[in-house]
Curated annotation (Swiss-Prot):
PANTHER family: FAD-DEPENDENT OXIDOREDUCTASE, THIOSULFATE SULFURTRANSFERASE GLPE. GO terms for cellular component: cytoplasm. It is found in: Cytoplasm. This is Thiosulfate sulfurtransferase GlpE. GO terms for molecular function: thiosulfate-cyanide sulfurtransferase activity. SUPFAM superfamilies: Rhodanese/Cell cycle control phosphatase. Gene3D superfamilies: Rhodanese-like domain (3.40.250.10). The active site is at C64 (cysteine persulfide intermediate). Transferase that catalyzes the transfer of sulfur from thiosulfate to thiophilic acceptors such as cyanide or dithiols. May function in a CysM-independent thiosulfate assimilation pathway by catalyzing the conversion of thiosulfate to sulfite, which can then be used for L-cysteine biosynthesis. The gene is glpE.
Length: 109
């Protein structure tokens, strides 16, 4: 399995302030109801396009519901050539509890 690191919401916030890309792998309805501000929804349909156009050297944070599914996705993305990949511990649920003002709604960011 490819290398990624698990990080806390506080560590993710620091990376975000330094330009990290955040992707959310939850279902589209959950993403539309609330997500990390500035994050991009990533699913099987948008994955290829995302990888093709992404900066593989930019820090990448993967978020899911509770921090479990994001680990598999982070490992996959690291295997696709991303050099600095992180899985958000606690997922969006812990993020929302920690940084409620850093969330957004809607289907696109």
């Amino acid at each position: 399995m490819s290398e990624f690191k698990r990080i806390s919401p506080q560590q993710a916030q620091e990376l975000r302030s330094n330009g990290a890309v955040v992707v959310d792998i939850r279902d589209p309805q959950s993403f539309a109801l609330g997500h990390i501000s500035g994050s991009r929804h990533l699913d099987n349909h948008s994955l290829h396009d995302f990888i093709t156009h992404a900066d593989l050297d930019a820090p990448l944070i993967v978020s899911c519901y509770h921090g479990n599914s994001s680990q598999s996705a982070a490992a996959y993305l690291a295997g696709q050539g991303f050099s600095e990949v992180y899985s958000l511990d606690g997922g969006f649920e812990l993020w929302r509890a920690t940084f409620p003002s850093e969330t957004a709604q809607g289907s696109e960011e």
